């Protein structure tokens, strides 16, 4: 008899536990905030941030876009220097923001200063200067050397993907940026 009484006591406890679980489940359904993770949900990969490197500077949104923007700028000249400077700085501000939106204008300028020292950028810059000189009909080699001596040409080895032949090596001159710093 004692086993029958203990079996019925166990059954009662099991039934009570089941009822309590059902009540808890019903209460949880009523107060479901949707905070529990769903195994079916997939995390969205983070958007890759653009790097501010020489590839980006040389790309279509880099210096070529700046050259196109410069053609649209109309400077008034003598007597309007402040307005012209404001217009140029505004254009540069827009260009740097489009090139790398996460950086401030001051940060962008410091990045550009650093990137301008890379060999591939120097070679491209010299090519663009020569293109402009040909368009204007002037000699671009006169502006090649800005230092006190004309022996500041850098001896470079080819191996850069931007250098088409060894004649491009002559386009690269040393920067005299130490005066500015």
Curated annotation (Swiss-Prot):
Q: What is one Gene Ontology biological process annotated in the Swiss-Prot or TrEMBL record?
A: DNA replication checkpoint signaling
**Domain of life assignment:** Eukaryota
Keywords (A to Z) from UniProt: Cell cycle, DNA damage, DNA replication inhibitor, Nucleus
Instruction: Map out region (Disordered) in residue numbers.
Output: 1-47
Compositional bias, Acidic residues, is annotated for: 28-39
Compartment list: Nucleus
Tell me yes or no: is Membrane among this UniProt entry's keywords: no
Query: GO CC annotation: what is one?
Result: replication fork protection complex
Tell me the Pfam families matching this sequence.
Swi3
Q: Where is the composition biased (Basic and acidic residues)?
A: 9-27
Gene Ontology terms for molecular function: DNA binding; double-stranded DNA binding; Y-form DNA binding
Task: Tell me the disulfide pairings in this chain.
Answer: none
Q: Which family does it belong to?
A: Belongs to the CSM3 family.
Quaternary structure annotation from Swiss-Prot or TrEMBL: Fork protection complex (FPC) consisting of swi1 and swi3 interacts with mat1 cis-acting sequences and mat1-proximal polar-terminator of replication (RTS1).
The free-text function statement in the UniProt record for this protein reads: Forms a fork protection complex (FPC) with swi1. FPC coordinates leading and lagging strand synthesis and moves with the replication fork. It is required for programmed fork-pausing which is necessary for mating-type switching. FPC stabilizes replication forks in a configuration that is recognized by replication checkpoint sensors. It is involved in termination at the mat1-proximal polar-terminator of replication (RTS1) and also required for activation of the Rad53-like checkpoint kinase cds1.
Which protein are we looking at? Answer: Swi1-interacting protein swi3
């Amino acid at each position: 008899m004692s086993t029958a009484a203990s079996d019925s006591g166990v059954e009662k406890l099991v039934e009570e536990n089941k009822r309590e679980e059902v009540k808890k489940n019903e209460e949880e359904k009523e107060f479901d905030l949707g905070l529990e993770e769903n195994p079916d949900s997939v995390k969205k990969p983070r958007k890759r941030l653009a790097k501010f490197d020489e590839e980006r500077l040389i790309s279509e949104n880099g210096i070529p876009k700046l050259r196109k923007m410069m053609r649209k700028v109309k400077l008034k000249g003598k007597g309007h220097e402040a307005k012209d400077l404001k217009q140029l700085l505004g254009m540069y501000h827009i260009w740097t923001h489009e090139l790398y939106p996460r950086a401030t204008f001051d940060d962008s300028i410091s990045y550009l200063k650093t990137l301008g020292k890379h060999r591939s950028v120097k070679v491209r810059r010299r090519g663009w200067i020569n293109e402009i000189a040909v368009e204007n009909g002037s000699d671009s080699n006169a502006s090649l050397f800005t230092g006190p001596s004309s022996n500041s040409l850098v001896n470079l080895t080819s191996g850069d993907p931007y250098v088409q032949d060894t004649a491009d090596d002559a386009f690269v001159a040393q920067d005299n940026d130490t005066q500015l710093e």
